[in-house]
């Protein structure tokens, strides 16, 4: 992972606290490596499911 990818992952970790899965998904598009895209995608999916659980959708 590049330094830029590490910064994107750190930003996504901050966004996870606010259940902002769509913004994390946008960061996924900015990632430079496949590994970073995978990590960010997993974070977006996890955040989406946490948001659903918090809203009692599941």
Placement of each model-derived feature along the sequence:
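N-terminal acidic leader/helix
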Residues: 2-26
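Short, charge-rich amphipathic interface segments used for partner binding and complex assembly
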Residues: 19-58
């Amino acid at each position: 992972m590049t330094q830029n990818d590490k910064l994107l992952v750190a930003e996504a970790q901050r966004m996870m606290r606010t259940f902002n899965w769509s913004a994390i998904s946008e960061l996924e598009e900015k990632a430079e490596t496949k590994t970073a895209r995978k990590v960010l995608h997993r974070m977006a999916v996890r955040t989406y499911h946490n948001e659903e659980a918090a809203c009692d959708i599941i």
